[in-house]
Regions:
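Short helix-capping segments at alpha-helix termini
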Residues: 277-279
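Mg2+-dependent prenyl diphosphate-binding active-site environment of isoprenoid biosynthetic enzymes
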Residues: 31-273, 283-295
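N-terminal amphipathic/basic leader segments beginning at the initiator methionine
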Residues: 1-30, 299
Length: 299
């Protein structure tokens, strides 16, 4: 098992240090409608974005930048792009045509509270706002900003969020299966794409090399697999009965112990990639601790 000495700051200290700055930046860049045409749109935007959440994606962007010497205060506008896209994906995921979920994070889902039409508009608003966060706010680094902008396009597209959602729809209808982890990784397209986006945007804006970005992408994909598999294990632990006619997952098909072993293998491989390819730093230490957290989290 790969271990690393504790560095200057623990993961949770790092998150707390940047939490206020993240929340401030989220509020400063809300995709709000002008007062003249505003109805309930702005209320729905705030409801969707400030309904809880760990702000994992902004933290990943900051860590991705700091891994290559970037500064949080410079990267911050771009750091919230992943959170906007993540929020949009949750809204779409809950819609009647998708998962038809009535709750999200213990609260009424957006389409249940504000209506399906407004929920779709809010989701599109978050996606649209994410582009400007990297391009407009980092115009002084045009080449890097363009590369970061391209990351958003890829994340949202068929190789990422849209593709992942289409896989979810197919699995819900009984097409395909997740009886092996290769198929499960396809199911995780949305999760892994957002992890990859968050880390790579920060790294790109900090000047990471192409080779470093390739390595970081592999780590991000493993992080996404670990996050999704731990989610499935949490669901399995909370109430296995709910899966009677629901979408099958690797954890359900293969059993809890097999899934736990698979999760441990993913975590160790992700940590190995970090340790072997990036020098010791606060950012690396926090990413290692985050990887361990995903293997141990209960909610």
């Amino acid at each position: 098992m790969i271990e690393e000495k504790q560095e200057k700051a623990e993961l949770w200290q790092y998150i707390e240090k940047h939490r206020a700055q993240i929340e401030k930046s989220l509020r400063e860049h809300l995709p709000l409608a002008p007062p003249k045409i505003e109805t309930q749109f702005n209320e729905a935007v705030e409801y969707a974005l400030f309904s809880g959440g760990k702000r994992l994606r902004p933290v990943l962007t900051l860590l991705g930048a700091e891994l290559f010497g970037g500064k949080a205060e410079i990267i911050m506008p771009a750091a919230i792009a992943g959170e906007f896209i993540h929020t949009s994906s949750l809204i779409f995921d809950d819609l009647p045509a998708m998962d038809n979920a009535s709750e999200r994070r213990g609260k009424t889902s957006l389409h249940e509270k504000f209506g399906e039409g407004l929920a779709i508009l809010v989701a599109i608003g978050f996606l649209n706002a994410s582009y400007g966060l990297v391009f407009v706010n980092h115009a002084n680094l045009p080449e890097r900003a363009m590369l970061a902008h391209a990351e958003i396009v890829e994340c949202i597209g068929a190789a990422g969020m849209l593709g992942g959602q289409s896989v979810d729809l197919a699995l819900a209808k009984g097409a395909g299966d997740v009886s092996n982890f290769e198929n499960e990784s396809v199911r995780n397209l949305k999760t892994s794409a957002l992890m990859r986006l968050s880390l790579r945007v920060g790294a790109i804006l900090a000047g990471a090399s192409h080779l470093d970005l390739v390595t970081l992408s592999r780590f991000a994909e493993l992080l996404g697999d670990a996050y999704q598999l731990s989610d499935d294990l949490i669901d399995l632990e909370e109430d296995s009965a709910i899966f009677g006619d629901a979408q099958k997952t690797f954890a359900i098909n293969e059993g809890k112990q097999t899934a736990i072993r698979q999760l441990q293998n993913i975590v160790e491989e992700a940590k190995r990639i970090l340790v072997e390819n990036f020098p010791p730093s606060e950012a690396r230490s926090c990413l290692l601790q985050l990887t361990d957290y995903l293997a141990q989290r209960k909610a």
